Amino acid sequence: MDKLKIQVEVAYALPEQQKIIPLAVVEGTTAYEAVQMSGITHFFPQIELDSAKMGIFGKSIPEPKSHALREGDRVEIYRPLKIDPKQARLNRAKKG
C-alpha cells in the first residue's frame, strides 16, 4: 500500500533573494529529509545542511533529522547570525 503524501514547503532567504519550494512527501518525512529532497542547495550552495538551523513557521526545531513533518508545514532554513543581537543593540545605543 502506498504511503500517504503530504504537502510541505522548504524556504530559504537572503536579503536579495528568496526561494520557497513546494514538495509532496510521504507522511513521516523529517524536516532534514524534506530539505534534502527539495534541492534547495542547488539554488543556494552556501547552505551547510548538516549544521544549518531549521524551523517550522518561525519556531526553531532542535532536531531537524528526527522532526516529522505535518501537512502544510513550511521548513525554514536559518542563516547564521553575523553579529550577536545583544551586541547589535549596544552598537545602536552607542550611536545614539
Curated annotation (Swiss-Prot):
The protein, known as: Protein RnfH
Entries under SUPFAM superfamilies matching the protein: MoaD/ThiS
Family stated for the protein in its record: Belongs to the UPF0125 (RnfH) family.
A Pfam family per the record: Ub-RnfH
NCBIfam families named in the record: PRK01777.1
Coiled-coil residue windows: none
